[in-house]
Amino acid sequence: MGTEENSSLEPQELWQQEYDKAHLRDVPFETMSGVPVDPVYGSEPYPGQYPFTRGLYPSMYRSRLWTMRMFAGFGTAEDTNLRFKELLRNGGTGLSTAFDMPTLMGRDSDSEWSLGEVGRAGVAIDTLADMEDLFADIDLSSVSTSMTINGPAATILAMYIAVAEQNEVTPNQLAGTIQNDILKEYQAQKEYIYPPRPSMRIITDMVKYTTAEMPKWHPVSISGYHIREAGSTAAQELAFTLANGFAYVEAAIAAGQNVDEFGRRLSFFFNSHSDFFEDCLLYTSPSPRDAHESRMPSSA
């Protein structure tokens, strides 16, 4: 859409052009009463256009539904592996990994600090062998994996890559997300290991690596959920989350990264609370704000 030919088109024409190129799901797009539903209603901005209030892609969920994955993890790696396979057999299209507290804090299961917490509310991962058991007989080239971990994120991602390579799956084939949002740990969840500056260095190194080697991977999931659960309002959740996101972008730019290369792989995780209209605003506000900030000279 950056050609001179496209620049002369109206927004609606641009959207229609891109929509017509999209591969749509082979299902009827209609209401339960059989009334056809148009691909878009109203005026500009259209889906897939700046500032992306109506979504990132011209065809949105008509092309592909969001990934269906249940948060899962308990006991040993073998226990969770069986659960993963059960979820995939019953319609799951991705995996979402919950780790136990010792793993989240970078501790071994046999540490005195881990007493009573091993395998509770998440799976225990101490070694590469555990990671091998966790994903045994699962084709990592065909499944998207989310891993909710922050302080030890670099170690866990390295283990995941090693397991994939043992099964002849290269890093550029891997799709998924690692939370890796350390700033919200200091603010809300408190599961951090290192001080802020070294932690930010690790994150920027991971952004650099995944941008170069793992084009299907999201290296940071910027999370407002934990901030809301710690007692914030919806507005505060949005404010802290966006501030954290801009901090990661600025740190990566300062380390020599190009925001146009890594920015599209940053994801967000917000809380779905009990106020319908507040949540509608919460989920639609970040896109135009991010789009505006990314066009500013300081972010280029």
Residue positions per predicted region:
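Catalytic alpha/beta active-site cores
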Residues: G2-D279
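Conserved small/polar residues in nucleotide/adenosyl-binding loops
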Residues: Y283-P288
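Recognition helix of helix-turn-helix DNA-binding domains
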Residues: A291
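Hydrophobic alpha-helical segments, chiefly the membrane-spanning helices
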Residues: S294-A300
